[in-house]
Amino acid sequence: MEADITNLRNKLKECEDERLKAAHYGLQLLERQTELQSQLDKCHEEMMITAEKYNQEKHALQREVELKSRMLDSLSCECEALKQQQKAQLEQLEVQLHRSHRQEVSDLKNKLENLKVELDEARLGEKQLKQKLDLQGELLAHKSEELRLLSEQRVLSSMSSELLALETELTAAEGVKNALKEEVNELQYKQEQLECLNTSLLHQVDRLKEEKEEREREAVSYYNALEKARVENQDLQVQLGHALQQAADPNSKGNSLFAEVEDRRVAMERQLNLMKDKYQSLKKQNAFTRDQMNKMKLQISTLLRMRGSQTEFEQQERLFAMIEQKNGEIKHLLGEINKLEKFKNLYESMESRPSTSDTACVLEDSTYYSDLLQLKLDKLNKENESTKDELSIQRMKALFESQRALDIERKLFTNERHLQLSESENMKLRAKLDELKLKYEPEERIEVPVLKRRREVLPLNITTPEETEETAAASATEDGVSRLPPHREEESCLNSLKDNTVQWKQPASSCVQPASLSPHKNLHLDTQPKKEKKCVKLVDSPANIEVLHEQSGNTPNSPRLTAESKLPTEVKERIETTSKLGKGACKKSHNIIYVSSKSAPETQCSQQ
């Protein structure tokens, strides 16, 4: 029995050793599995990131390829259009050059023929002049010889009268002969000139015939081209008529489709014309505003720098907050890992205790203890697996949340960039609007509001000698007030208004505007003075008034009438004098202020 017990105990020890080894190997396998799982997760994440990058690069490259293909197509179309245009221009230039060359050649030929004719005429004239000169020289020599002979004969001997008469007749006959010779020579010269002119005219006739033939050939070619164009036009008209008949035929298929296409074509042509007009106007506007935009570049750059530094600081703070959050999560995970390592070490220490102290224990106690440990081990394995699953799920959730947070962060950053760009564009437009206002708004004059007043309108005024004296006194006071300085004029005006119980709606001090007005706030005063009502005034002399009273026979009532009419006339004169004084004071006390249209650095700072 003891041998069996020892054998069983040895077997139990071997089984426990094997279990411990199996547990140790299982832990090692679990650790390796976790490491492999973590490596697999990392590889999967890296693979996903690289796949996303490659997909993004692929999408970007596809877009670039599409854009480049479209650009190549557009460039090829433009090249073909340019080639056709250049061919047409080259043909037109060739035709124009051919025509101009032909015209120049004809002009040069005409000039050459004219020069030839002039040269022939000059040669002929030179020849004729030489011949005349020779004849004149011969005649002169002959005459000189005759004179010499006559002088010798007169000196040597006295000649008879008959000989002298014969000699005179001979000289006269020779003179006639010479005159006839000269006439013959002149006629020959004229004949030669006429022959030259005839030859030149014949050459011109030949040249004109050649030009006529060329023009006839050109006319024939133009006529043939016109006939061909007419034939082509007739063919096109026939085709157009067939197309219109087919379009108007309701039984033909695709009529509505062709009509829709035609309507769309017409609409697109109209839209194209509108867009061309808009493009031209915008092009002019851009060329006009380019100079204005160059002035605002410095201010806009400073504003963008300020805004960019602010956004970078906010982005940096957000990134620091995210880093702190991730550091806290890492610390929490490290604490959990430390706890698990402590539990693992405790479990290994419990399993590695020597079992020599339990040699005296009973077999049933050892089996019970081993079963209990086995149950605990299974339970711990299950908990470990569940925690691993939860940990992997939490990791995936954390990765998903981090990816989502990064996407949201990117979107937020892009939105901030767009906001920054929109604000900068808004600032640009505001600055541009201010400059355009400064440039194009005319200098407006600040009008001083005219004070409203109340006047009594009397249909008839009858003056008396006393009233004339009062009017003279009022005019004297008015002259005295006009000589006063502006401050005293205002005081006198206000005092007179207080005495007459007429209130001003606006004080004179409110009319004075500050000199430092901004160029963007132009004051538009809409208050305008009311038009004065018309009233009839009849002023008569005292003699006329007395005559009227005598005619009417109301002499005893005249003092009462004058006393009654005296009061309203006095009131009216006082109101008129006060209004005149008020106008003069307001006009003299307020200076007109002009606002400069040029943009100064102080005004630009106020705009910023």
UniProtKB/Swiss-Prot annotation:
InterPro entries: SPDLY_chordates (IPR028593), Spindly/BICDR_Dynein_Adapter (IPR051149). It is found in: Cytoplasm, Cytoskeleton, Microtubule organizing center, Centrosome; Chromosome, Centromere, Kinetochore; Nucleus; Cytoplasm, Cytoskeleton, Spindle pole. Signal peptide: none annotated. GO terms for cellular component: centrosome; cytoplasm; nucleus; outer kinetochore; spindle pole. Monoubiquitinated with'Lys-48' linkage. Deubiquitinated by USP45. It comes from the Eukaryota. Residues 465-487 are annotated as: Disordered. Belongs to the Spindly family. Interacts with KNTC1 and ZW10. These interactions appear weak and may be transient or indirect. Interacts with dynein intermediate chain and dynactin (DCTN1). Interacts with the catalytically active form of USP45. Required for the localization of dynein and dynactin to the mitotic kintochore. Dynein is believed to control the initial lateral interaction between the kinetochore and spindle microtubules and to facilitate the subsequent formation of end-on kinetochore-microtubule attachments mediated by the NDC80 complex. Also required for correct spindle orientation. Does not appear to be required for the removal of spindle assembly checkpoint (SAC) proteins from the kinetochore upon bipolar spindle attachment. This is Protein Spindly. It comes from Mus musculus (Mouse).
